[in-house]
UniProtKB/Swiss-Prot annotation:
Highest rank taxon of the organism: Eukaryota
GO molecular function: ATP binding; RNA-3'-phosphate cyclase activity
Reactions catalysed according to its record: a 3'-end 3'-phospho-ribonucleotide-RNA + ATP = a 3'-end 2',3'-cyclophospho-ribonucleotide-RNA + AMP + diphosphate
NCBIfam families per record: RNA_3prim_cycl (TIGR03399)
Annotated source species: Macaca fascicularis (Crab-eating macaque)
UniProt protein name: RNA 3'-terminal phosphate cyclase
């Protein structure tokens, strides 16, 4: 099964955990042995952190692969994949490391397994420097399912920084191939909704204040739509630790979804958290694209694997997206073209089309 070994420099471009996620997922899918060097070389704490390690171990277990050099602080790993299998797989960051990032690395792999999979992912569900689980369920899920598969995400417990302790269970069945997607028509915004949550000891007033501040901020720019942000107190038995945050979604007439989100920190007042999320959403609505800045890079691996040409329209192409494209081209040999959008209404905006000729990956087990 093994092809020639792929050599990856983990310090280039985004230079972080994303390079590991993209390269190990593609290595696993394509049966290519992989060596990643200089892992997170430029970061303040270089090398593997607990959440990266749990992701690597999970991919190893998904395919009965061999993994060397995988320990906290290690800056070099080698990975030799075998056949991807379904069944129940568990990954636990044992920290507030993001369960959503564990999903990012494992999901493309289990789509090409021999049988249905159930992923038990433990860590932070609403953590910094990663999508919140609400984003994954409300934005990522409906869009990524356009590639022609379905998954179920059951949030058992929410976990926050610094303790983690959250758990989600993801269930999905394998596919024969992925369909290409074409997301180039934004349409107009028809709905804005969201949730502002508090968990643990934080008073419910914090959730109400975040929601109210966000609504006021959005109203300044969008006056003709009802903005429905629900304040929520997470049930005690479904949340571990204390936390607060907000996610706001805008939905368009063509089914595009955009989000703005923010998490509370000690000493930051609730209004500021709400306004930060609202401003992020508004910025994502200004650029004319069909996906927000956080969805861009999460679609690249699926576009690379799909059978045909995919197109998405984006705002400014993020470094994460450029990095994902670089490794999808290097490892999977997919072909990407990124060009400025030519549409009349996009002329004044920083809007791009990312086009990919996918490799038409076929599940050998089906």
């Amino acid at each position: 099964m093994a092809g020639p070994r792929v050599e990856v420099d983990g310090s280039i471009m985004e230079g972080g955990g994303q390079i590991l996620r993209v390269s190990t997922a593609l290595s696993c899918l394509l049966g290519l042995p992989l060596r990643v060097q200089k892992i997170r070389a430029g970061r303040s704490t270089p090398g593997l952190r607990p959440q990266h390690l749990s992701g690597l171990e999970m991919i190893r277990d998904l395919c009965d692969g061999r993994l060397e050099g995988a320990e906290i602080g290690s800056t070099e790993i080698t990975f030799t994949p075998e056949k991807i299998k379904g069944g129940i797989h568990t990954a636990d960051t044992k920290t507030a490391g993001s369960v959503c990032l564990l999903m990012q690395v494992s999901m493309p792999c289990v789509l090409f397994a021999a049988s249905p999979s159930e992923l038990h992912l433990k860590g932070g569900t609403n953590a910094e420097m990663a999508p919140q689980i609400d984003y994954t369920v409300m934005v990522f899920k409906p869009i990524v399912e356009k590639f022609g598969f379905r998954f179920n995400c059951d949030i058992k417990t929410r976990g926050y920084y610094p303790k983690g302790g959250g758990e989600v269970i993801v269930r999905m069945s394998p596919v024969k191939q992925l369909n290409p997607i074409n997301l180039t028509d934004r349409g107009c915004v028809t709905k804005i909704y969201g949730r502002a949550f508090v968990a643990g000891v934080l008073p419910f007033k914090v959730a109400k204040d975040m929601a109210a501040a966000a609504v006021r901020c959005i109203r300044k720019e969008i006056r003709d739509l009802y903005v429905n942000i629900q304040p929520v107190q997470e049930p005690k038995d479904q949340a571990f630790g204390n936390g607060n945050g907000i996610i706001i979604i805008a939905e368009t007439s063509t089914g595009c979804l955009f989000a703005g989100s923010s998490l509370g920190k000690r000493g930051v007042n609730a209004d500021k958290v709400g306004i930060e999320a609202a401003e992020m959403l508004l910025a994502n609505l200004r650029h004319g694209g069909t996906v927000d800045e956080y969805l861009q890079d999460q679609l690249i691996v699926f576009m690379a694997l799909a059978n045909g040409v995919s197109r998405i329209k984006t705002g400014p192409v993020t470094l994460h997206t450029q990095t994902a494209i670089h490794f999808a081209e290097q490892i999977a040999k997919a072909k990407f073209i990124v060009k400025k959008s030519e549409d009349e209404e996009d002329a004044s905006k920083d809007t791009y089309i990312i086009e990919c000729q996918g490799i038409g990956m076929t599940n050998p087990n089906l």
